[in-house]
């Protein structure tokens, strides 16, 4: 029963990516990585799609420090700092809460009755495609290091924007 908690955790993390650095199409590989996990937990591909794509898009819509729209727009408007930051965080929290509730409601319905999924027929084929074989190596040290470097890099960008007022040149 606790696997359902993975939905809000992932959506919040991806939403933070959307709101801070404009994560958008960068999430496509996450779909491929997460779909077998969510299949194994009894969910459908639409649940995985909503988690991976709605999370960052909600973040992008309520951008806080996203250099691709907030910082450029504020620069063009001559606004220094980020005076609407608190409002944007509140708006992000409201939109994320509503979206997470919707996705969790859908996911629980599908888990209870898989044939009610709008992607049921397609998922039967996808489940065969994503079956693991003995050649799969799992999550290696190299994979962990790549994720660590990515996370540190994103953290540095967010820190630079918030603490030092970095703009496009510094990023």
At which residue positions do the language-model features occur?
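Helix N-cap and loop-to-helix transition residues
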Residues: 2, 44, 80, 140, ...
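Hydrophobic transmembrane alpha-helices that form the pore/transport pathway of multi-pass ion
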Residues: 2-60
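Generic detector of intrinsically disordered, low-complexity, polar/charged segments
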Residues: 12-15, 19, 52, 56, ...
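Transmembrane helix-loop junctions in multi-pass membrane proteins
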Residues: 17-26, 69, 158-169
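Membrane-core helix-loop-helix motifs of multi-pass transport proteins
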Residues: 36-120, 137
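Long, contiguous bundles of hydrophobic transmembrane helices that form the permeation core
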Residues: 85-171
């Amino acid at each position: 029963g606790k696997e359902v908690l993975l939905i809000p955790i992932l959506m919040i993390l991806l939403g933070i990516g959307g709101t801070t650095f404009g994560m958008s199409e960068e999430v496509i590989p996450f779909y491929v990585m997460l779909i077998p996990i969510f299949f194994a937990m009894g969910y459908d591909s639409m649940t995985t799609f909503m988690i991976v794509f709605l999370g960052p898009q909600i973040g992008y819509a309520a951008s806080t420090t996203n250099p691709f729209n907030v910082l450029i727009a504020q620069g063009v408007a001559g606004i220094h700092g980020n005076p609407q930051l608190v409002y944007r965080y509140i708006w992000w929290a409201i939109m994320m809460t509503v979206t997470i509730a919707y996705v969790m409601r859908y996911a629980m319905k599908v888990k209870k009755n898989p044939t009610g999924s709008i992607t049921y027929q397609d998922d039967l084929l996808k489940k065969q495609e994503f079956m693991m074989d003995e050649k799969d190596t799992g999550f290696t040290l190299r994979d962990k290091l790549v994720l660590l470097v990515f996370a540190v890099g994103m953290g540095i960008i967010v820190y630079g924007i918030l603490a030092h007022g970095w703009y496009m040149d510094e990023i």
